[in-house]
Structures are given as structure tokens and as C-alpha cells.
């Protein structure tokens, strides 16, 4: 069709007209998911044909979600809303132990590498701050993770956020280009789409203060445990140009 795919459209349309593009963009995104699903099926069938599927651990996760005008914006990288942070995480253990079991506890990106290393019988690196989400028997080990921290520094948008099972706090710089409120507090039980900002309500100030303190604790721990910078290397000018075009430099 004539509509640009989600992965390539931003350079052409920074702010698409939602009345014209919302449904086509969502459909394009769904098509990409279906395309990926077909190839994952082929991968799994290949593992089964080679006798590897039953003894293999598989972790499926997305790097981020996408905005489809949920909060008056598009694409990704500019906010810490749920549509960007809450992504699928599927773990298939050897012999499909605990297959079909859902875990409603908190899971964080920093936990993925320790989980995969643990399943392989290897220790996590000293610089890793996460922890295994489960063990080889399929037993969940993340029941006591109470909070998940996220931060964003992209295109002038500086944000920190903390999420518990029932609350979400997002802080942003006052002059952020995206134009989001500097403080946002959401009840994730009654308002999972994050449409009612509770930050200014007098009865919410105590929990707001507590969540701000938790964000500060996370920031302090990150600085205290930050590894030493690695060696710098020169990169090819062509590679640098490609990385700049993708927004990584």
C-alpha cells in the first residue's frame, strides 16, 4: 500500500494527522508484528527439527513500545508512559517447564541479562544491578521487586519515572520539547491508560513525596554503582554518519 511503514515514517512525518494516520499506522504496526510472528514460528520449527527446542531456553522481549497518539504524540523515545515502557516478556524454559504460567510481579530490563546467565549456569557480572526473574525449575524469584525505575534523555526531554504495581510517577524537565507536565502521578489500578494526572491533588501529596524519594534513591544507587568508563575507540566516518541518522549519536 502507499502508506509508509512505522519503522521509516518518522523522517517524513514527525507529527502525523491522527484523523488520517492513526488507523493506518496502527495497522502497519500490527502487520509488522504478524510478520515477525511468522518468522519466529519458522525459527521454533527449525529448532524442533534439529532436536534443540526442548533443551533450549528462549527469551522474547521488545526494546520499547510505540506511541499512537495515546498522549498526543507519536513514535518513541520522548516519554515514559506505559505504552512505551510496558512490553511483552516471554520466557520459555528447557522442557517448557511452567509453560503457560503468567507472572504478575515486577520485571525490569536490568533483570534480563542476569536471568539468561542464571539459566545458563553462569554468574551475573559484578556491574549488573539486576537479578534473575526465575530459576531453572521455573520458580519465580521476583516477588519482592517493589519498584521499577526508568529514565529518558532524548531530544531535550529529560525524565525520570518509577513504577509500582499500583502507581506510576513521571518527572520531566520544565522546558521539555514534548510539552508534558513536570510531575505526573497515576493510579495504575483505576487509570491504566494514564489519562488522569493526580499530582496536584492534596490527598496524594504523601505518596507523591514517597515516590520522589524512591526516584532519588535509584539515582543515587546508579551513580554509586556506575562502572568505570571503558576505552574509547575511533569509528569509521560512514558508520558515525549512519549512527547519527538513526539518532544514536
What would you call each of these model-derived segments?
Residues 1-249:
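Catalytic domains that recognize anionic headgroups
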